[in-house]
């Protein structure tokens, strides 16, 4: 039962945070949002590795949902740096990479958890922090200041994502 709660809360936080992070990346650039999300995710995995109670793991999953919401920013980054004729292919590669990650991640987590239940969190923290360092040193900004827009809570409202569902309700 708790596994379902943990998964639902992660997805709910990602749903709420995705449009906010997207709007922040439109305002401040893709790079800072991606960097802060990777840093936050790395620190969050450390929190979960050290969590003394189930409650702390729950807090960690909430934070993880927010920081994982930067996927929209990653897709925006790819849209910024690829030509329109290569964009669909690039999005397909990203989708495949995420799919492979969702297959390999739990399997690797199971192997690592057999060694220690906290080891998967430490390894995930290492990957996230390595991604942060890579981005800090190598990742250029893809969204130039002249293309940035003001932050708008109206655009960042996650309820607005549900609006297209009205097409199916009569």
Where are these regions (language model features)?
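Helix-breaking motifs and short loop linkers at transmembrane-helix boundaries and internal kinks
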Residues: 29, 50-52, 67
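Juxtamembrane intracellular "pre-TM" segments in multi-pass secondary transporters
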Residues: 142-170
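Structural signature of the two symmetry-related core transmembrane helices
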Residues: 32-47
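Helix-loop junctions at membrane interfaces in 12-TM secondary transporters
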Residues: 47-60
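MFS-fold secondary transporters
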Residues: 44-48, 64, 135
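Helix-loop-helix hairpin linking two adjacent transmembrane segments in secondary transporters
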Residues: 97-137
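Residue-level signature of mid-helix packing/kink "hotspots" within the transmembrane helices
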Residues: 11-19, 69, 102-103
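Cytoplasmic helix-loop-helix junction between adjacent transmembrane helices
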Residues: 60-99
